[in-house]
A protein has these predicted regions:
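Conserved nucleotide-diphosphate donor binding/catalytic pocket of glycan-assembly enzymes
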Residues: 81-180, 199-209, 301-304
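Positively charged, low-complexity intrinsically disordered leader regions
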Residues: 1-24
């Protein structure tokens, strides 16, 4: 795969021609990854493309079924081209989806992640006039925090590429992550939340204690945090734990808990809470994408790439921040918002 993409990279290294923004009608965005967080992280790019190319429709090449729900309120997102979640169990379908990339013509095909071989290959397979593979040329190794973040890098990348086609960079702020919840969804989320919490008259602090692999904090760690959280805020706030589909609670279900199979309903409930606290995971990014101030907990060195991204959120390095200091951060955010 790497050898093939190396050849393709050389073939499409310097696209030539003219791009007139109002004439761009169809764009393909390639992010063949099925994780919730990774698909949410492309929402700022989709918004950027919609502003830059006002007459375009956007197709997405992804993995799994999540994108259909995440982007259902994006009016200019059209086709969701989905790789099956388990390709070896659906090999024929998997191959067929790859070949379907040749079915439609695009003005622009964009790969999101530079080191994704499947993303680069999918962009190059298309019948597209311009194929952008995600590189920032001399800025690929830049250490600037803004460029490291996976919600921001694709936007900076496309801005730099388009500047080479004399499309001006307006230097506007990069949009927040957003699943565009409707007013009806938000109202239903409020109704669901009020049916769960102990006192609907109080605002709610929401926690999510699960994460995959090494990102998941121990029960001992979470129980210490919950004890301090409960001591500091139980009188003034409800505390709600949103559960994963595995029905696992790192605080042994000591707080009222709730789960939904509907990812948009889950987002709508979180949107009606005061603050959201979670380790690095897809649901953390979901909280950011519904504009709830989010405290993201990190113990690895990828904090600059995957910190919760919205106005009011913060990433905490738990290697240097203990439970007491975490409560101080939460206190600051509660008063700020």
């Amino acid at each position: 795969m790497k050898g093939l993409t190396y050849y393709i990279d050389r073939l499409y290294a310097n696209p030539k021609g003219t791009i007139i923004p109002n004439d761009v009608k169809r764009i393909l965005v390639c992010r063949p990854n099925g994780r919730l967080g990774n698909q949410l992280l492309i929402t700022p790019l989709i918004q950027e493309l919609s502003e830059t190319f006002p007459n375009c429709t956007i197709d997405l090449f992804v993995k799994g079924n999540l994108a259909s729900f995440l982007f259902e309120n994006y009016n200019n997102v059209d086709r969701i081209i989905r790789l099956p979640g388990k390709p070896f169990k659906e090999l024929g379908k998997y191959i067929g989806v790859w070949w379907s990339l040749r079915k439609y013509k695009y003005d622009i095909a964009i790969n999101i992640v530079p080191n994704s071989s499947s993303g680069r290959l999918s962009a190059c397979l298309t019948r597209s006039r311009f194929k952008f593979l995600g590189d920032l040329e001399d800025e690929r190794s830049v250490s600037h925090t803004e460029l490291q973040h996976m919600a921001k890098f694709p936007v900076y990348s496309i801005r730099k590429i388009l500047s080479q086609f004399s499309i001006p960079n307006k230097e506007r702020p990069i949009q927040e992550m957003d699943i565009k919840l409707s007013q009806a969804e938000l109202a239903n989320g409020k109704k669901v939340l009020e049916s769960i919490v102990t006192n609907p008259e109080k605002e709610t602090i929401c926690i999510y204690t699960f994460a995959t692999g090494g990102k998941c904090y121990s029960k001992t760690w979470w129980e210490e945090v919950y004890k301090k959280l409960n001591s500091a805020y139980a009188e003034k706030y409800n505390i709600l734990e949103v559960l994963p589909k595995e029905n696992i609670s790192q605080i042994n279900f000591k707080a009222p808990s709730w789960y939904s199979l509907d990812i948009r309903e889950m987002g709508a409930v979180i949107a009606n809470t005061k603050i959201f606290i979670s380790a690095d995971c897809g649901v953390m990014h979901l909280a950011s994408a519904v504009h709830t101030p989010t405290v993201g907990l990190f113990s690895s060195n990828n904090i600059n790439r995957y910190a919760p991204y919205n106005n009011g959120s913060i990433a905490i390095n738990t290697n240097t921040t203990g439970a007491a200091e975490l409560i101080e951060v939460i206190e600051h955010l509660l008063h700020k918002h």
